[in-house]
Structure formats: C-alpha cells, structure tokens
C-alpha cells in the first residue's frame, strides 16, 4: 500500500542551531529501508550561516533548488553553490552552508545510514 501527502501540508520545523527551517518530507519510520534516514526540504534565510556540523554514521546528499552561497568543510575546502548543484557529505565530515546573499536559499537533503 502506498501513502500520499501534499508537501504544502507539511509543517516547518526549526533546524540545528536555529539557523534555518525545514520540512521533514520523509522520515525513517515512514519507510521499510534499513539505510534510509530522512528526506527534508531546507530553507536558509538571506545572510544566515548553517553552522559547522556533522552527521554521525549518516551520508548526506544536498541538492540546491534556490539561491546561492558557500559550502565549507572542516578541512577548509570551500565551494560556491548555486541552483542545480549536488553535494555529498560523507559520514562524520563537518560542513557548513552559508547564504551570503540577500535572498533565501532552498535545498533538498537526503540522508542514509553509512552502515
């Protein structure tokens, strides 16, 4: 049996460090996969930085759908992001996302367990 939900009906919730907001599109308990963790839609307001963080035993895929800015990792690697870019953050790699513009940025985040 399948399930349906309209994304407009999903409530916004805060993110780590209150540096943005997100919608939990699919959570682990809504699937039967032992590796799937979550799929969210994230929002980072203009001029805000999503602070350096990591995901223990979680691989995170980030797809930019709106806006531009900078992504950094703990080793100092810096990449600009723009609409259409895809990033993969391996488990345990600290990273931050900075919206250094005057417009909101939006992303899909997909997370899988590493093991």
In which residue ranges do the predicted regions lie?
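A generic structural signal for short beta-strands and their flanking turns/coil linkers
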Residues: 21, 35-40, 60, 67, ...
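Short, charged/polar surface micro-motifs in flexible loops or helix N-caps
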Residues: 32, 45-48, 68-70, 113-115
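A short beta-strand-loop-beta hairpin characteristic of the jelly-roll/cupin
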Residues: 49, 55-83
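Ligand-binding loop in jelly-roll beta-barrel domains
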Residues: 91-115
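A short, N-terminal "cap"/entry segment at the start of jelly-roll beta-barrel domains
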Residues: 1-37, 51
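Conserved metal-binding segment of the jelly-roll/cupin
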Residues: 44-46, 81-100
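Short acidic/proline- and small/hydrophobic-mixed sequence motifs that coincide with surface turns
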Residues: 34, 79, 104-106
